[in-house]
């Protein structure tokens, strides 16, 4: 059976090439919103962090109807760190729309997601977006995209893909640059003509592969997947087959069934082959599980998800200021929250450690883990994390292997020398260098993942904010040797109390301060950064001794340099292997793992003697 009235597509793109805006426009022009309805920009990015950072983290499901054909659209993340989302979502669709910026052209994450789509033999429609930009170069971008297809071993059918030119912001698409157009109709028509309709046997045994998990506090866990064969009905008895252990089968009942319409889930009594549905009523449903008929339960193979490459320890905050600002502070709270994240994030790994209060959390990159940390912080959690470390492997001969990444950098010509020097120091190897438009140079490096830990902030400083850096995981390669991360030491408070202007004034001569007057500090807390390689202990709580001629009012004459406020990413980049980042809903504090100065010195002596 072929469902000619349905098309299932994923929209894939490099970060910030406009795919979420494109989906917004398709929603508007298909009549999802009332004419007088106020519509937020990027309505598909519902998560606060997504809106703030302008990125998509979680894949979203929506549906529009065009000329009696229902088009299920899935907006996928463009970041390689959230590749786990992309890989499994592609199993639900019959084709993809690849969105490429008309100026920037084919970029690294484009390569990452496109490779996954081509491996699954999905047909591709290429949408050259932002053609209204004055510096747009659509003809050159077409050549770049076709070159990328060839590099990724696309077959002849995939190479013969249609190109659509669009401006999602202005709401039009066209098949040729010379055409006149004021709507997205050419893109709608191309989707219906080129993307195959879903196929399956309506009368066969039911098979639904669960590709994503949603959660609703009223109905609990909701599994989302495509019906490959058979039908689903409300109150139907089915069997849930676990993808880890196919022999582990459980009889369950479907309490509610939904299809997607616009941005909403609509309750239905029955759904058939090709439909993307949401199912509630199954408490322990997981990503990768298959819902089957009880008569013949056969699991659908699950797309292998790329392994994590970076890990950090999440632990209970044990600083002297612990428990004062957070709502959830115990190891039980921390454990429950991390385990809950595993329900919806297949790329994440959480392991217990020897220490009851510490958990090893592994992910696909610094961004992946920093988004989790930021979400937990906003929910009221208080905890501490260690420096990110890469996950090593060994080959058959026992040689150490480490994750390697391809790093693409676009910088103004005058900064390229400094970037090459910095990345060479971090074991990066220059693979390619070419001039691009507007006085920029494009650099391509092969570099260990650990060489990029803590580099992004340095990169923005070196390029005065004008550089663009993108990375994509390549493969595991031979260990490249030790890397020296931070050349500056820390300013460490050696007395607990409140920071005072006089103490800060004396301390600022030693380096850059991270705190201001009135802030609470404790012994072992890092209050700033020195200009030299070694750590320096300072007393920021020091007060001036008063005399008849010296009164405390003379403190007002002391001028403090404004403190340097670190964002979460900057703080994660800054910390060294012997330091922790204390995270609370109100503050980020950096501290030494060993707070006692005497014990810390002994530990350093032992480390240096090894």
Outline where the language-model segments fall.
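Structural and coupling elements of P-loop NTPases
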Residues: 1-610
């Amino acid at each position: 059976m072929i469902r000619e009235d349905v098309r299932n597509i994923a929209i894939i793109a490099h970060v910030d090439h406009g795919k979420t805006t494109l989906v917004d426009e398709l929603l508007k022009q298909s009549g999802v919103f009332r004419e007088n309805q106020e519509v937020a920009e990027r309505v598909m990015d519902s998560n606060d962090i997504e809106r703030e950072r302008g990125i998509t983290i979680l894949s979203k499901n929506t549906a529009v109807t065009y000329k009696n054909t229902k088009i299920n659209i899935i907006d996928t993340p463009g970041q390689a760190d959230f590749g786990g989302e992309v890989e499994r979502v592609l199993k639900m669709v019959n084709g993809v729309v690849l969105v490429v910026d008309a100026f920037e052209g084919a970029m690294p994450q484009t390569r990452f997601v496109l490779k996954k789509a081509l491996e699954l033999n999905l047909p591709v429609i290429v949408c050259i977006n932002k053609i209204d930009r004055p510096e747009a170069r659509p003809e050159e971008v077409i050549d770049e995209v076709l070159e990328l297809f060839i590099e990724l071993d696309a077959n002849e059918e995939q190479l013969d893909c249609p190109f659509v030119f669009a401006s999602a912001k202005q709401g039009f698409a066209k098949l040729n640059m010379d055409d006149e157009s004021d709507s997205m109709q050419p893109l709608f028509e191309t989707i219906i003509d080129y993307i195959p309709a879903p196929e399956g046997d309506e009368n066969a045994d039911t098979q639904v592969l669960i590709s994503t998990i949603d959660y609703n506090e009223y109905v609990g866990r909701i599994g989302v997947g495509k019906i490959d064969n058979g039908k689903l009905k409300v109150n139907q008895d089915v069997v849930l087959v676990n993808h880890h252990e196919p022999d582990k089968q459980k009889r369950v009942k479907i309490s509610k069934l939904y299809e997607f319409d616009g941005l909403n889930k609509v309750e239905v009594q029955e759904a058939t082959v090709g439909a993307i549905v949401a199912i509630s009523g199954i408490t322990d449903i997981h990503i990768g599980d298959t819902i089957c008929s009880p008569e013949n339960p056969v699991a659908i193979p699950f797309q292998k998800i790329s392994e994590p490459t970076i890990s950090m320890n999440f632990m209970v905050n044990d600083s002297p200021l612990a428990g004062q600002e957070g709502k959830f502070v115990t190891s039980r709270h921390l454990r429950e929250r991390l385990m809950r994240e595993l329900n919806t994030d297949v790329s994440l790994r959480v392991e217990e450690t020897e220490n009851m209060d510490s958990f090893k959390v592994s992910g696909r990159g610094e961004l992946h883990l920093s988004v989790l940390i930021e979400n937990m912080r906003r929910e009221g959690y208080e905890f501490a994390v260690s420096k990110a470390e890469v996950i090593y492997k060994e080959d058959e001969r026992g040689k150490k292997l480490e994750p390697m990444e391809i790093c693409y950098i676009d910088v103004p010509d005058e900064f390229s020398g400094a970037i090459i020097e910095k990345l060479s120091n971090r074991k990066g190897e220059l693979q390619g260098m070419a001039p691009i438009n507007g006085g920029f140079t494009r650099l391509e490096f092969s570099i260990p993942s650990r060489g990029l830990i803590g580099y992004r902030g340095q990169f923005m400083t070196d390029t005065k904010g004008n550089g663009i850096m993108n990375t994509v995981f390549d493969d595991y390669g031979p260990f490249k040797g030790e890397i020296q991360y931070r050349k500056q030491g820390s300013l460490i408070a050696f007395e607990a109390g409140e920071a005072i202007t006089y103490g800060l004034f004396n301390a600022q001569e030693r380096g850059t301060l991270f705190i201001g007057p009135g802030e609470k500090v404790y012994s072992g807390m890092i209050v700033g950064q020195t200009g030299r390689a070694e750590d320096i202990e300072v007393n920021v709580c020091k007060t001036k001794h008063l005399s008849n001629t010296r009164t405390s009012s003379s403190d007002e004459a002391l001028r403090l340099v404004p403190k340097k406020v670190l964002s979460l990413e900057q703080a994660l980049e800054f910390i060294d292997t012997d330091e922790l980042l204390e995270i609370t809903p109100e503050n980020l504090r950096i501290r030494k793992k060993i707070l006692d100065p005497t014990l810390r010195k002994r530990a350093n002596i032992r480390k240096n003697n090894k």
